[in-house]
């Protein structure tokens, strides 16, 4: 990986339409897993003016009141009135969920001592870097924190003119591979019509940007773009159609690591798009936490119905304290990257996924996020 002098990442709030869709899909997954941990779930959501549509494939023994669940998620995010353009209590809810293909189930399920096969073919990446305490790239980490702060101030009423939809973008200046300054910040937030742009700019600067970004990184030449197009009253699903899985770079490393292309939300852990990406993060984070490298990227790949990965690759970009080939041996020794091994290693058959669906799947040391633990450090250090 080349050394950047500038690097930019973005994030979006829980009220962004694509993130609404992700949260609905993961809320459905959670509700099913809470009662049927062996369910197969692949649920996609679309939200647009006045409606939420869910579709996909599910195999489960439980029953979920999807309409009430979907409405509750929308209302919880903050779309609770026609005044903000979308109301979870009155929007149409359309359900086009069907059964999982028997052909897929036959190839994936465990039976007659056959191990759980990967739910699909594909390639996944995990990444960690020591440029932040949580071993995440700084641009995406701080982009998440900005929109998370926007939501906090909206929900606690401190800035009661804020509305749910918001986006952030952070450009950091790097010196010798380490972030040293903020070059530019973009924050666009939906708002009520009766607040002035001057009030918005001052509040966003003082209450969001300055309380979130490290003061020592802000300087006289930092560029601030706060609602740069002017008013942002029309937002959420009225302003843009939202779809599950359309923020895969926001969900991961903000572009600083590669991405295999598979989205996460709405997928149960038999889908390696999700579970193997979580495992990749777990492996890479433990390697960096153990001091074996200052940056580490893991690639894994799978064939549908086959348990063993078709490949496992390690790249430390020349930062490793030992050879990448030696780190690869340690990975094989200490991490089981078969689908069943990942599920058991990270305890993934739990209703923990809606929480992942906004503000990043990685770099948040929540108790449910087992892939953020660094409990393999001692074993890796030998």
Curated annotation (Swiss-Prot):
GO terms for cellular component: cytoplasm. It is an enzyme of class 2 (transferase). Keywords: ATP-binding, Cytoplasm, Magnesium, Metal-binding, Nucleotide-binding, One-carbon metabolism, Potassium, Transferase. L-methionine binds at residues 57, 100, 240, 271. It catalyses: L-methionine + ATP + H2O = S-adenosyl-L-methionine + phosphate + diphosphate. It is found in: Cytoplasm. GO terms for biological process: one-carbon metabolic process; S-adenosylmethionine biosynthetic process. InterPro entries: ADOMET_SYNTHASE_CS, S-AdoMet_synt_C, S-AdoMet_synt_central, S-AdoMet_synt_N, S-AdoMet_synthetase, S-AdoMet_synthetase_sfam. Pathway: Amino-acid biosynthesis; S-adenosyl-L-methionine biosynthesis; S-adenosyl-L-methionine from L-methionine: step 1/1. K(+) binds at residue 44. Its cofactor is Mg(2+); K(+). Its main location: cytoplasm. GO terms for molecular function: ATP binding; magnesium ion binding; methionine adenosyltransferase activity. ATP binds at residues 16, 165-167, 240, 246-247, 263, 267. Residues 100-110 are annotated as: Flexible loop. Mg(2+) binds at residue 18. Binds 2 divalent ions per subunit. Binds 1 potassium ion per subunit. It comes from the Bacteria. Its EC number is 2.5.1.6. Belongs to the AdoMet synthase family. Homotetramer; dimer of dimers. Catalyzes the formation of S-adenosylmethionine (AdoMet) from methionine and ATP. The overall synthetic reaction is composed of two sequential steps, AdoMet formation and the subsequent tripolyphosphate hydrolysis which occurs prior to release of AdoMet from the enzyme. PANTHER family: S-ADENOSYLMETHIONINE SYNTHETASE. This is S-adenosylmethionine synthase. It comes from Saccharophagus degradans (strain 2-40 / ATCC 43961 / DSM 17024).
């Amino acid at each position: 990986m080349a050394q950047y002098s500038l690097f930019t990442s973005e994030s979006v709030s829980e009220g962004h339409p694509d993130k609404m869709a992700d949260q609905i899909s993961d809320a459905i997954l959670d509700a099913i897993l809470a009662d049927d941990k062996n369910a197969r779930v692949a649920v996609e959501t679309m939200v647009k003016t006045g409606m939420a549509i869910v579709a996909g494939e599910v195999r489960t023994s439980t029953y979920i009141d999807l309409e009430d669940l979907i409405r509750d998620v929308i209302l919880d995010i903050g779309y609770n009135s026609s005044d903000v353009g979308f109301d979870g209590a009155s929007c149409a809810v359309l359900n086009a969920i069907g059964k999982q293909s028997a052909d897929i189930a036959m190839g994936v399920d465990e039976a007659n001592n056959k191990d759980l096969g990967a739910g699909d073919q594909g390639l996944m990446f995990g990444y960690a870097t020591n440029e932040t305490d949580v071993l995440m790239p700084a641009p995406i980490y701080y982009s998440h924190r900005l929109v998370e702060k926007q939501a906090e101030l909206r929900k606690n009423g401190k800035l009661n003119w804020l509305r749910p939809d918001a986006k952030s973008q952070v450009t950091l200046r790097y010196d010798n591979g380490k972030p040293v300054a903020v070059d530019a910040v973009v924050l666009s937030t939906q708002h009520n019509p009766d607040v002035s742009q001057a009030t918005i700019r001052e509040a966003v600067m003082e209450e969001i940007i300055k309380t979130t970004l490290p003061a020592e990184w802000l300087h006289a030449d930092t560029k601030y773009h706060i609602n740069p197009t002017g008013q942002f009253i029309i937002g959420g699903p009225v302003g843009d159609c939202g779809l599950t899985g359309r923020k895969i770079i926001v969900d991961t490393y903000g572009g600083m690591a590669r991405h295999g292309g598979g989205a996460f939300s709405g997928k149960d852990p038999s889908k390696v798009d999700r579970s193997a990406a979580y495992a990749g993060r777990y492996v890479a984070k433990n390697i960096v936490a153990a001091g074996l490298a200052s940056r580490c990227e893991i690639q894994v790949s799978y064939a549908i119905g086959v348990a063993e990965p078709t490949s496992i690759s390690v790249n430390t970009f020349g930062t490793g304290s030992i050879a990448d080939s030696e780190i690869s041996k340690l990975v094989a020794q200490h991490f089981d990257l078969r689908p069943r091994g990942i599920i058991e290693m990270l305890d993934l058959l739990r209703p923990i996924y809606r929480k992942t669906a906004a503000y990043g799947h990685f770099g948040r040391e929540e108790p449910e996020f087992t892939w953020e633990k660094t409990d393999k450090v001692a074993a890796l250090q030998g």
